[in-house]
Every structure is written in C-alpha cells, then in structure tokens.
C-alpha cells in the first residue's frame, strides 16, 4: 500500500513487445557528417537515394583542393602564378550536378602561365641592385655562397662553374655552350705562350800562369772564341805575352820533394823559430814553349827584342862560396852535406867546454 504508487510504472512489458532499435529512437533521416581523414560517418543504417550519393561524391571531388597536376618539385627560384578556378554548379532535369569551369583551360595553359622570377638559375638580386649567386652542395648539405656580382650574367656564369664542379656533366647550367668556348680559349692561350729559352753564354774566367817569374803578373779572363768581340787590354797593366789559341791552358804543377820535408832539429831550440818544407811550383813546358811571336817587344833599334824576365832561376852551386860557415873542422865541407844532414846531430859533444883550470891564476891571494 505504501509503495505501490511509486513502482507501479516499473511493471514489465508483455513478452510479445518488440525491442527498441535506432529506427525507433531516431526516426528522422540523419545527414552524413565529416570526420577525420576525409571519411564520412553515417548516424544510422538508413537507405540513401542513389542520386543524392552521386551528388555528394562529386561535391567531395570539387572541394578536395588542387589537382595532381599542380603538385611537383619546384625550384627556389620559380614562382607559380595560378588563378583559383571558379566553379559553377548547374542542376539538370534529373537533379544531377554538372560541373562547368570558368577560367581553366587545362595543364597547357597553366604551364604557359608559369613564370620564372629570375632569368638565370641560382642567382637573386639584392635590394641595392647587386646580384648574388649561391648553390646547394649535396655532399655538405649546405648552401655555398659564391659572391656578389655587378650583373646577372656574371653571377650566372659563377653558378655554372660551381655547378659543373659539383655535379659534372649532369649539372643544370644557364649557359650550356660555355665549356666549349672556355676550352678553346685555354688551348689558344697555351699555344700562344711558347717557352722562350734565351741563355746568354758568358765567357769563362781562367787564370793564365804563363809568366810565373813575374809575381805581379796580371790575371786576365780567357776570351770566348765563339764571340766576335775583340779582347781589349786595359791600361796600366804589366805585359802578358799572348798565348796560342790552339794550345790548351794547363794548371801549374806543384812538386814537393820528400827529402826536403825533413826538419832540422837540435837540443837547444827556440819556440819562435819556424821551419817549413821547400815547395816549388813548376809551370808546364807546353805553355812556355808555345809562345806567339807577339810576345816579343818591338823597339826602334832592334826589330825583335825578347822580354826581360825578372827573378830568373839561379843555381845553388854558384852561391856555394858565399854560404860557407865558420865552423871548426868543417870550413871546407860542402853545403850539400849540410842540406843532406850528413853532419852529426850531437852538437854538444863537438864543442869544447871551458873549465876553471884554464883560467889564469892571479897573485892577489
């Protein structure tokens, strides 16, 4: 009694009643709504008309955006100017939508409307009028700055040179004919610049030892016989006889006798006394014998007078009487015995030493 009024509506339905479905809960037709990913979600399992489905599908194609012809790889320097197409829908008698385009003439018209911002590839103009060139290096993954140029052509040629260096023959350049002309110019420059070897032959200087008797003999350079310039003898120089050109110039021969290298020594010597071996220099006979007739001096009295040779060689036997020493038991010995060291080395034994017995005795003590 107390609770019957509250729960009377909770009584179960008879078994013959049907189950609730979506059609019973939402009897009106639901329009499809857009979801993520461009898919359509339908609220209920309602059969749709074929004509409405075709119209909705065509509307989806129109609103999907640009066609696949517009998509592609674009350069940084290319600017695409495309006018948006104006679409108009017209309904036919059978309620099918037909699309008519205004201002769309196909892909050929679009490609004609594509316009490059710069005439050359890889360059751009600065606000102050200069032209900058740069290129992307695929190996480094960065843009390489090529510099700023006064004209667009100079910048384009700099881009072409760097592109050929990086990509080789596959590079896209602004001036394809530039490499052939550059090679021709390089070939012409190499042929024009031929090596010119101009070696000046300088006369060699050789000393003439044909007048060894004169210590102040002048040493003159031997003239090169291939040159046509005559040899000019300077003033204030001692006379040097002319040599025969056919005779070879030989160096002086220096002879040193082994016997003359022996040094004389005694028990009582001085530190400041220096003794050197005798070294004689002898000129070759060929240079002295082959003297031209021009070596003789012409005088007024005699037609040919031989030149006066100073410091002529003197034989030692001629000076032997003047070189005798006042020695006891050796006054008559030859100088040859002294030079050959035939004398005894014991100088002390040959000397007579005095003693106190030899002194006279005085009578003062």
UniProtKB/Swiss-Prot annotation:
GO cellular component: nucleus
DNA-binding region residue numbers: 119-176
Domain notes: The AP2/ERF domain binds specifically to the 5'-GCCGCC-3' motif. The affinity of this binding is higher if the seventh amino-acid of this domain is basic.
Gene3D superfamilies: AP2/ERF domain
UniProt cross-references to Pfam families, sorted A to Z: AP2 (PF00847)
Entry's localization field: Nucleus
Chief site of localization: nucleus
Keyword Heme: no
Protein name: Ethylene-responsive transcription factor 1
Residue ranges of the region described as Disordered: 176-202
Record-level GO BP terms: defense response; ethylene-activated signaling pathway
Family to which the UniProt record says this protein belongs: Belongs to the ethylene-response factor family. Class 1 subfamily.
S-S bridge residues: none
PTMs per UniProt: Phosphorylated in vitro by MPK12/BWMK1.
GO molecular function annotation: DNA binding; DNA-binding transcription factor activity
Quaternary assembly: Interacts with MPK12/BWMK1.
Keyword Calcium: no
Ranges in a coiled coil: none
Keywords: Activator, DNA-binding, Nucleus, Phosphoprotein, Plant defense, Transcription, Transcription regulation
Role summary: Probable transcriptional activator that may be involved in defense signaling pathway. Binds in vitro to the DNA sequence 5'-AGCCGCC-3' of the GCC-box element found in pathogenesis-related (PR) gene promoters. The transcriptional activation is enhanced in vitro by the presence of MPK12/BWMK1.
């Amino acid at each position: 009694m107390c609770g019957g009024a509250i729960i009377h509506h909770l009584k179960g339905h008879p078994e013959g009643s049907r189950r609730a479905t979506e059609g019973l809960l939402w009897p009106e037709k639901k329009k499809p709504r857009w979801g993520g990913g461009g898919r359509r979600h339908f609220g209920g399992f309602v059969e749709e008309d074929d004509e409405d489905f075709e119209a909705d599908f065509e509307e989806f194609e129109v609103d999907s955006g640009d066609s696949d012809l517009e998509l592609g790889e674009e350069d940084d320097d290319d600017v695409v100017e495309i006018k948006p197409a104006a679409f108009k829908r017209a309904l036919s008698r059978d309620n099918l939508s037909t699309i008519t385009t205004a201002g769309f003439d196909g892909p050929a018209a679009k490609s004609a409307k594509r316009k490059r911002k710069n005439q050359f590839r890889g360059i751009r103009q600065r606000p102050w009028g200069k032209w900058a060139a740069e290129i992307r290096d695929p190996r480094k993954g960065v843009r390489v700055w090529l510099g700023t140029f006064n004209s667009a052509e100079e910048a384009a040629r700099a881009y072409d040179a760097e592109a050929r260096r990086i990509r080789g023959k596959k590079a896209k350049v602004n001036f394809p004919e530039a490499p052939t002309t550059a090679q021709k110019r390089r070939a012409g420059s190499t042929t024009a610049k031929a090596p010119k070897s101009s070696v000046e032959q300088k006369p060699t200087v050789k000393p003439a030892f044909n007048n060894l008797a004169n210590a102040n003999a002048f040493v003159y350079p031997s003239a090169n016989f291939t040159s046509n310039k005559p040899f000019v003898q300077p003033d204030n120089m001692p006379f040097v006889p002319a040599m025969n050109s056919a005779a070879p110039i030989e160096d002086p021969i220096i002879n040193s006798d082994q016997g003359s290298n022996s040094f004389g020594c005694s028990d009582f010597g001085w530190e400041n006394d220096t003794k050197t071996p005798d070294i004689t220099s002898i000129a070759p006979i060929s240079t002295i014998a082959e003297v031209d007739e021009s070596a003789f001096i012409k005088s007024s009295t005699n037609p040919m007078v031989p030149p006066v040779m100073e410091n002529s060689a003197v034989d030692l036997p001629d000076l032997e009487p003047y070189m005798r020493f006042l020695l006891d038991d050796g006054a008559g010995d030859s100088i040859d015995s002294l030079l050959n060291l035939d004398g005894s080395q014991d100088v002390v034994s040959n000397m007579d030493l005095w003693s106190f017995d030899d002194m006279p005795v005085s009578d003062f003590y």
